[in-house]
């Protein structure tokens, strides 16, 4: 979509989101929405998995209709769930932040598509700090430990290494 201008909003001041309360995550996400709407964004994609899991429904159902009804807001959960459900046969592991696991969004959405799937949600609180601290050896070890537990594994966290 080269005909569009893009704005990247990265909330580095409040990271990581995974250990925050749902109220904090919603507040941070609403702040981002207001900023992006003030910049005349017509489409906003919440690329943070935790913010999508915790705040997207509220934003789509309550905030946007009142505050900016012409704006479309999407997240990362539904596209991922659609692919995972198509590829999974019996059991899926969801490895994510504590806040994402608490939301049960992946379990709910996967069961809408395939109610027979067995889904295990696992919080990975050590993974984000390992990546943010550039400890890629530890991050790789943790990912392997989580992934080895499941035939189908969804790994959900989007931290960035810190300089």
Annotated model-derived regions:
Residues 1-32, 98-139:
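N-terminal glycine-rich anion-binding loop in soluble enzyme alpha/beta folds
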Residues 27-37, 73-91, 100:
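Hydrophobic alpha-helical segments within soluble ligand-binding/sensing domains
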Residues 27-40, 141-153:
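Short, well-structured alpha-helical segments in soluble
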Residues 53-87:
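Glycine/small-residue-rich loop that forms an oxyanion/phosphate-binding "nest" at active or ligand-binding sites
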Residues 156-163:
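Conserved small/polar residues in nucleotide/adenosyl-binding loops
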């Amino acid at each position: 979509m080269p005909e569009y201008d893009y704005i990247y909003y990265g909330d580095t001041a409040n990271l990581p989101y995974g250990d925050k309360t749902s109220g904090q995550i919603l507040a941070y996400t609403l702040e981002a929405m207001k900023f992006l709407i003030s910049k005349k964004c017509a489409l906003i994609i919440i690329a943070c998995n935790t913010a999508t899991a915790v705040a997207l429904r509220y934003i789509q159902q309550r905030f946007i209709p009142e505050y900016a009804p012409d704006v479309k807001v999407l997240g990362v959960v539904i596209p991922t769930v659609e692919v995972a459900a198509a590829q999974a046969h019996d059991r899926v592991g969801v490895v994510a932040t504590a806040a994402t696991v608490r939301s049960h969004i992946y379990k709910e959405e996967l069961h809408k598509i395939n109610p027979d799937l067995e889904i295990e949600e696992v919080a990975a609180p050590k993974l984000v700090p390992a990546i943010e601290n550039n400890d890629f050896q530890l991050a790789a070890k943790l990912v392997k430990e989580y992934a080895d537990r499941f035939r189908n594994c969804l790994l959900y966290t989007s931290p960035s290494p810190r300089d």
